[in-house]
């Protein structure tokens, strides 16, 4: 029985899923918007939002926790130097999911996941 088990399996084993979301979280922090399938976007939200909340309080311990979850110093630096201060006054809800149709090959529902207060630089790069 799968009672009270949260999270989606996404037809992957645990280590594959963990690595995939670690990479996707890094891409979202780096580019501030990514395109993926809707279920992956909904699950990625559960990974990225706690990272941004962690980045709102800058400490060595929090930086080490963020590094343990992302394994990328560049991402940790952006989280704590840019995103933490940017979202300091916002109590959660740092990401937005926008549905964008269906993929041509397999008709999978696609979505953009983005950070809500994207910088103008990131918006120009996305277009």
From Swiss-Prot:
PROSITE patterns: RIBOSOMAL_L17. One of its GO terms (cellular component) is cytoplasm. Keywords: Ribonucleoprotein, Ribosomal protein. Pfam families: Ribosomal_L17 (PF01196). One of its GO terms (biological process) is cytoplasmic translation. InterPro entries: Ribosomal_bL17, Ribosomal_bL17_CS, Ribosomal_bL17_sf. GO terms for molecular function: structural constituent of ribosome. The keyword Protein biosynthesis does not apply. Belongs to the bacterial ribosomal protein bL17 family. Part of the 50S ribosomal subunit. Contacts protein L32. Requires L15 for assembly into the 50S subunit. This is Large ribosomal subunit protein bL17. It comes from Escherichia coli (strain K12). The gene is rplQ.
């Amino acid at each position: 029985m799968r009672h009270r088990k949260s999270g989606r399996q996404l037809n992957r084993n645990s280590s594959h899923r963990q690595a995939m979301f670690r990479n996707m979280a890094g891409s979202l922090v780096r580019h501030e918007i990514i395109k993926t399938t809707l279920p992956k976007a909904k699950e990625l939200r559960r990974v990225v939002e706690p990272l941004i909340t962690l980045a709102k309080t800058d400490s060595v311990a929090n930086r080490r926790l963020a590094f343990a979850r992302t394994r990328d110093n560049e991402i940790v630096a952006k989280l704590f130097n840019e995103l933490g201060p940017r979202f300091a006054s916002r109590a959660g809800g740092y990401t937005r999911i926008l549905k964008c149709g269906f993929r041509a090959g397999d008709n999978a529902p696609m979505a953009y996941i983005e950070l809500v207060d994207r910088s103008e630089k990131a918006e120009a790069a996305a277009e």
